[in-house]
Amino acid sequence: MGILGLSKLLYDKSPNAIREQELKNFFGRRIAVDASMSIYQFIIAMKGFQDGQGLELTNEKGDVTSHLNGLFARTLRMIDEGIKPIYVFDGKPPKLKADELEMRRQKAAEAERAFEKAKDAGDDEMMEKMSKRTVRVSRDQIDESKKLLRLMGIPVIQAPSEAEAQCAELVKKGKAWAVGTEDMDALTFGSTVMLRHLNISDAKKRPIVEIHLDEVLQTTGLSMDQFVDLCILLGCDYVPKVPGIGPQKAWEGIQRYGSIESFLESLDTTKHPVPADFYYKEARAFFQNPEVTRAEEIDIQFSEPDEVGLIQFLVKEKLFNPDRVNKGIARLRAAFTRKTQGRLDSFFTITKVPQQTAAARAPLVGTKRPRDGKYVHVSGTLRKATSGHKKAVKK
């Protein structure tokens, strides 16, 4: 879930902290990528629907390969642009997330029932919508994704808990420049730079959204502690929302009272009853001090691709097109042997112009709003681009 409504709120309150970029603009950058989120996106993007049945991208043996196809293609695309991705995988979820995970399971079960109901009614549009809501990333898909990345020579990090928190740790300690994820809580965990839409296909022509935490804090006048409290009030994975407290009330509450404690004291509890399990102090502590492996203990190494291993895994086991795999290996080798060309901004000290706080700045007219974050079905182009694979009815 991330942080509910935070993206739109930042566009409203701190638009200067947000930039739209092209992939090529991140040349030379190390980016810590939320691997589980990326794999989920690839599966959703390649999930089709036809004749009342959900379709998966499979090979000739019937093995689902959408996660490997997407990961292989997008990683190569980043490598081509001189980007150095570091994939971070989720570990054990914190106890605070138990209720959220149970709610997700219930929603998936509801989607299954809604799918069957729509099927009986012959509602293809509703069936396709519900089919995508039942998608889950399996343990086998995670393990295969790790294997592929290691064979490609791309660093893989196993987080002890939340991947976004581990990614933020790498950024805060200078091991990576930004976190690549759709979950806005990467900022709440303290990542100084966050990138959204990093894994969306170039064919959609959707820009990558770059958000700078320091500029958010400077423009809004919030401290980091207050920003964390704001995110908790907006709605996060670890505590329920306070009824009737939307983005604007949460924003005004933190601006006026400075903390969740003082804000709750001001509330009319008959209108806004605080849930008994609103353990905001525990959520705050987790955001401020999450379970991570210290960046200093992580050795990040990019290595040459394992050509024999890639051919064995992708071509012989997963039945990928040999020509496609060989071309991918050539691109990986070229990137590994390419002489490092530094970014211009590494040679200069760049001084940022101070920005006004929210109170001092006049309202901005015509501020750009974020685009819809829905995933668009593009199975047709993907089918064409992945020779040797086909759409098959999900068993």
Curated annotation (Swiss-Prot):
This is Flap endonuclease 1. Mg(2+) 1 binds at D34, D90, E162, E164. The keyword Transferase does not apply. Its cofactor is Mg(2+). Binds 2 magnesium ions per subunit. They probably participate in the reaction catalyzed by the enzyme. May bind an additional third magnesium ion after substrate binding. Its EC number is 3.1.-.-. It comes from Leishmania major. GO terms for biological process: base-excision repair; DNA replication, removal of RNA primer.
